[in-house]
């Protein structure tokens, strides 16, 4: 192919497309040199600790974990004994209850590495050459620009997991957001109670109650598994987890699938110990001791996220994932998942700004465009919210706004308010009775926020302070969505200033939440008209042919969760395409087959490439003539290779969502056959008709809008009344109390008929006893709700104790976390006491 490229005519065409010149081989210009990261200066604990100290970042004094001991699974999880006998659970579990302790260590892999670039993260040079070849073979007007963009992406980006320097610099940036020019503020400081935030969330994130069959929040996690060996009745109500993901502390190097039994044992132990502590003579002290004993459940592994980073920022920016301990993830998900699974309410099906559960396919994008055009016609402002993304339509201009390092803006009180919302609006029966007990209320409201917000993380053998919430925890989306809600509410209260004005940016200081304007799309009405009028009349979704359009359609670049809108003449509606920058980056750098189980199968790598090229076509490549032509050719070529090997392609492609980074967006689509126009029709055909005015109102506060609720809170007409839980629970309590009072009145001594003072005194004592019972009942009947509401209103967050380590040399001791030295660390008094108590409990079972 090199000879073809270097012919005088082709060489001139290629250089013209790339806007470059050379007297040598054209491939020297076409193909960028492979990126090799510089030597990482912070790849040792000593260097990292000194770097953090120099930048005044808090290093924690190392805390130890008891050494692992083997227990019989059926003894640790007696309810699941049958699963052990049937081989569904392993015979023994390893739990941290030894008589000595160890310091944990975690050294993540960073690829590509300075010393070994390897094949990981290599750019798709074959696709680049195919693009060049088809550029010469066809006369696509946008072809030169596409080739130039892909080549530029290869030259400036790099897929990989960054570096230690990038991770540490990211920590500093997160601290800068949390404590810098605009320090974080709690909702109370901004001026919101938890009930007021709940009222706002009823508009911005409407939720339903969990299914009736879902167990209440009253049980230890292992009780959510009903197993008898009968497939017709066996069922697990535990939240879904990705079994191939990291198990976190204390099981470093293992997956969730490896440690399911251990996670259940630890989660059970933690929630039970928490329950005992919460009902002890000194609940706060007891809870603190429990958290300290299980400190590792609030320490996440600082995992470098694989992304397409810019090469120039390789040592400056690596996104960190706070890999939560499996038991912590399990407990948090038990609170959120049953509610959110039943709450796919968003702007396309409900009168809410929320985009939760939104899919651009099956008419989703067209619904968004219909709502936008309706707002433009009525000259109304429009707002949409998804996690740390805010979208505002105002004065014919579309604004895409992101919270700056969104997770860093979070405080424990933000998460506490979200827990309050889930319990009072989700985990509550129609009669007002709570579906949770005091133990779970204590965990959700007082303990969980401190476990994942402003907690700690582990990198190398350094235990570090985490500023804001750990990214990737089970509440990341929910907490971010709450913070975006606060920003939008303050925007409404301020009179909806234009996002490009100082008045809008002043909301940062008011809310303690940093944000940035990612996109300003002016003249949106005219852009939409242009997209319709210039829509292609040939090719995919135009004339029904299985070819790309000669000239791509005009995209309405909303940046809506990474998607733009294209008008289809065939379907007479808008359909989604991936944002061009993201599409080009995906084409330039494949992520590779990350599913290790699939990777071991013969032909898996070839199947991955088929999936990759078909996915690129599906998410928007079909609208780019040159990219579509090259990707289609590559896909067909790889299919033939599998056929020659005698491998059935459908065996892989049925599970294609495990291979593609876009699998979650295209769930249910089969790639057993190459993409055709009919494929695009099928994936974009609406499931039902749509009228924006016919969307139902939010379930909890119908006939109210976000503007009305915000205005009511601001004006003082909103009095922060008791929630429905309180009112209905009060009614039930009064009914029970009145019964006792009636009994007391029946015993009331009658002076006209009773002369026996001893008898009268005895009856009076009975009456007083019943009245005391009534009074105690009035208090105890509200205990469950009061622990969830009253405690929250006092902003009480209970956290374990952690001490800063001022000497980085001590924190980075290379002996820490290695061999016999670490295992000879004595247990703390709390660890010793709890180990003895658990051993006694097991003997008594």
From Swiss-Prot:
This protein's UniProt keywords: Covalent protein-RNA linkage, GTP-binding, Nucleotide-binding, Nucleotidyltransferase, Phosphoprotein, RNA-directed RNA polymerase, Transferase, Viral RNA replication, Virion
Signal sequence annotation: none
Biological role stated in the UniProt entry: RNA-dependent RNA polymerase which is found both free and covalently attached to the genomic RNA. May also contain guanylyl and methyl transferase activities.
Basic residues bias (residue ranges): 833-845
Assigned EC number: 2.7.7.48
Protein name per its UniProtKB record: RNA-directed RNA polymerase
Chief location: virion
GO CC terms in record: virion component
RdRp catalytic domain span: 384-588
Keyword Kinase included in the entry's annotation: no
Post-translational changes noted in the entry: Exists in multiple phosphorylated forms.
UniProt-annotated location(s): Virion
Organism field: Infectious pancreatic necrosis virus (strain Jasper) (IPNV)
PROSITE patterns to which the protein is assigned, alphabetical: RDRP_DSRNA_BIR
Alphabetical list of InterPro entries matching this protein: Birnavirus_RdRp_C, Birnavirus_RdRp_palm, Birnavirus_RdRp_palm_sf, Birnavirus_RdRp_thumb, Birnavirus_RdRp_thumb_sf, DNA/RNA_pol_sf
Record region (Disordered): 686-706, 799-845
GO biological process, one term: viral genome replication
Oligomer status and interactors: Interacts with VP3 in the cytoplasm.
Residues annotated to bind GTP: 248-255
GO molecular function annotations of the record: GTP binding; RNA-directed RNA polymerase activity
Catalytic activity: RNA(n) + a ribonucleoside 5'-triphosphate = RNA(n+1) + diphosphate
């Amino acid at each position: 192919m090199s000879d073809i490229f270097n012919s005088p005519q082709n060489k001139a065409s290629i250089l013209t497309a790339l806007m470059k010149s050379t007297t040598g081989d054209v491939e020297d210009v076409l193909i960028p040199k492979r990126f090799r990261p510089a030597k990482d200066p912070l790849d040792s604990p000593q260097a990292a600790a000194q770097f953090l100290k120099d930048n005044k970042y808090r290093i924690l004094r190392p805390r130890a974990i008891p050494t692992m001991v083997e227990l019989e699974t059926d003894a640790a999880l007696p309810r699941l004994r049958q699963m052990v006998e049937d081989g569904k659970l392993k015979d023994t579990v390893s739990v941290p209850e030894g008589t000595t302790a160890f310091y944990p260590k975690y050294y993540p892999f960073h690829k590509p590495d300075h010393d070994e670039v390897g094949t990981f993260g290599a750019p798709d040079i074959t696709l680049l050459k195919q693009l060049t070849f088809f550029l010469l073979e066809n006369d696509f007007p946008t072809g030169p620009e596409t080739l130039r963009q892909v080549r530029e992406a290869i030259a400036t980006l790099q897929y990989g997991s960054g570096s230690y320097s990038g991770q540490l610099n990211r920590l500093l940036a997160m601290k800068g957001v949390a404590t810098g020019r605009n320090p974080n503020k709690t909702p109370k400081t901004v001026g919101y109670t938890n009930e007021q935030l709940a009222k706002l969330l009823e508009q911005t994130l409407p939720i339903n109650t969990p299914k009736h069959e879902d167990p209440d929040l009253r049980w230890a996690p292992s009780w959510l598994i009903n197993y008898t060996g009968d497939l017709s009745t066996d069922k697990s109500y535990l939240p879904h987890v990705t079994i191939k993901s990291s198990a976190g502390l204390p099981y470093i190097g293992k997956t969730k699938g490896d440690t399911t039994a251990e996670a259940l044992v630890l989660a059970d132990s933690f929630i039970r110990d928490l329950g005992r502590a919460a009902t002890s003579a000194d609940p706060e002290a007891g809870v603190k001791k429990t958290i300290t004993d299980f400190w590792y459940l609030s320490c996440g592994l600082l995992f470098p996220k694989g992304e397409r980073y810019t090469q120039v920022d390789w040592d400056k920016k690596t996104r960190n994932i706070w890999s939560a301990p499996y038991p912590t993830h399990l407990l948090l998900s038990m609170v959120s998942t049953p509610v959110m699974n039943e709450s796919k309410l968003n702007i396309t099906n409900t009168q809410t700004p929320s985009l939760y559960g939104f899919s651009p396919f099956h008419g989703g994008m067209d619904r968004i465009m219909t709502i936008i055009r309706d707002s433009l016609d009525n000259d109304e402002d429009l707002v949409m919210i998804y996690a740390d993304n805010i979208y505002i339509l105002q004065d014919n201009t579309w604004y895409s706004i992101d919270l700056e390092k969104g997770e860093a803006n979070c405080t424990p009180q933000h998460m506490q308010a979200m827990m309050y919302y889930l319990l009072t609006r989700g985990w509550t029966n129609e009669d007002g009775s709570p579906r949770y007990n005091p133990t779970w209320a204590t965990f959700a409201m007082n303990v969980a926020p401190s476990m994942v917000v402003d907690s700690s993380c582990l990198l190398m053998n350094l235990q570090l302070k985490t500023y804001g919430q750990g990214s990737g925890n089970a509440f990341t989306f929910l907490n971010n969505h709450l913070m975006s809600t606060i920003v939008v509410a303050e925007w409404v209260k301020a009179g909806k200033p234009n996002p490009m004005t100082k008045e809008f940016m002043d909301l940062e200081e008011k809310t303690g939440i940093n944000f940035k304007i990612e996109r300003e799309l002016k003249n949106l009405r005219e852009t939409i008209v242009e997209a319709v009028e210039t829509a292609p009349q040939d090719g995919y979704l135009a004339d029904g042919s299985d070819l790309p359009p000669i000239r791509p359609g005009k995209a309405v670049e909303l940046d809506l969760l990474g998607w733009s809108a294209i008008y289809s003449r065939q379907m007479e509606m808008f359909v989604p395409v991936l944002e061009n920058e993201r599409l080009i980056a995906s084409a330039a750098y494949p992520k590779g087959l990350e599913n290790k189980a699939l990777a071991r199968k013969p032909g898996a790598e070839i199947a991955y490439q088929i999936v990759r090229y078909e996915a690129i076509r599906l998410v928007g490549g079909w609208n780019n003539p040159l990219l579509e032509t090259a990707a289609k050719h590559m896909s067909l070529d790889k299919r033939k290779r599998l056929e020659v090997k005698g491998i059935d392609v459908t065996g892989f492609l049925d599970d294609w969502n495990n291979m593609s980074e876009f699998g979650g967006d295209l769930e249910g689509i089969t790639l057993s056959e190459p993409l055709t126009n009919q494929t695009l029709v099928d994936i974009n055909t609406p499931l039902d008709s749509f009228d924006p005015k016919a969307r139902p109102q939010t379930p909890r506060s119908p006939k109210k809008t976000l503007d009305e609720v915000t205005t009511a809170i601001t004006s003082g007409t909103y009095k922060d009344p008791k929630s429905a839980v309180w009112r209905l629970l009060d009614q039930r309590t009064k009914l029970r109390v009145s019964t006792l009072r009636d009994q007391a009145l029946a015993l009331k001594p009658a002076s006209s008929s009773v002369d026996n003072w001893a008898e009268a005194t005895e009856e009076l004592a009975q009456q007083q006893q019943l009245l005391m019972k009534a009074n105690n009942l009035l208090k105890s009947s509200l205990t469950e709700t009061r622990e969830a509401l009253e405690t929250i209103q006092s902003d009480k967050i209970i956290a374990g104790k952690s001490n800063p380590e001022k000497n980085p040399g001590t924190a980075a001791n290379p002996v820490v976390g290695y061999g016999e030295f670490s295992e000879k660390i004595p247990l703390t008094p709390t660890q010793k006491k709890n180990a003895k108590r658990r051993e006694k409990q097991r003997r008594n079972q």
